[in-house]
């Protein structure tokens, strides 16, 4: 999940599912009740992503976390302790219509759950931003997710880390497709902490409002990272949520 850069990355196997939880800390159990653990599969394998509950029956995640079968677990902290958690299949997945699977531009998706989540102290929704909300360079916000430890074993517990928003030109120098109007440039290279592949789809939370989606499929040791800027997609989000919630 949270990556100590370059040397440790080189030690990971090519098919590693996530980064390493280095410089991150274990979250207080159920302190982030909006977190969703997502498992999905295609014809070849089963994968994991993060996500977050935005309505009782809708989870937001990255569009590249799509598969033939998707299941969401809510209210979970330790993946080995499923008691009192809610496992809900996804009935419909709607990725953004302009999502590019190669560049990961417009990497946002809404999942309709087969049934509404039961809200409690461990399961709750998170606030979405307004369209005009603009996360600025220098802001420090938090990412949470489940990923691999430094020894390449899977983390059983939810981990979190604080990351600093960077100026867009830092990401433009690394990616020709970076677009500051719809993406966020996240992670201070001098701090050597970041997100990895296993954190895809997870929330970037600033002052209790989700402002970004981890949009990193094959993360290398280079910082900063590119996240989806949620505020830019609010018209699409409102329209799609209304569509998914029709009787």
Curated annotation (Swiss-Prot):
The keyword Transcription is assigned to this record: no
Swiss-Prot/TrEMBL keywords: Disulfide bond, Glycoprotein, Hydrolase, Protease, Secreted, Serine protease, Signal, Zymogen
Family to which the UniProt record says this protein belongs: Belongs to the peptidase S1 family. Granzyme subfamily.
Top EC class for this record: hydrolase
GO cellular component entries: extracellular space
Subcellular location: Secreted; Cytoplasmic granule
UniProt protein name: Mast cell protease 8
SUPFAM superfamilies in the cross-refs: Trypsin-like serine proteases (SSF50494)
Catalytic site positions: 64, 107, 200
Top-level taxonomic group: Eukaryota
Main location: secreted
Example GO molecular function: serine-type endopeptidase activity
Cystine pairings recorded for this chain: 49-65, 141-206, 171-185
Keyword Repeat appears in the UniProt entry: no
Glycan attachment residues as annotated in the record: 41, 71, 101, 151, 179
EC nos: 3.4.21.-
Domain Peptidase S1, first and last residues per copy: 21-242
Coiled-coil segments: none
One BP term from GO: proteolysis
Propeptide: 20
Signal sequence interval, chain numbering: 1-19
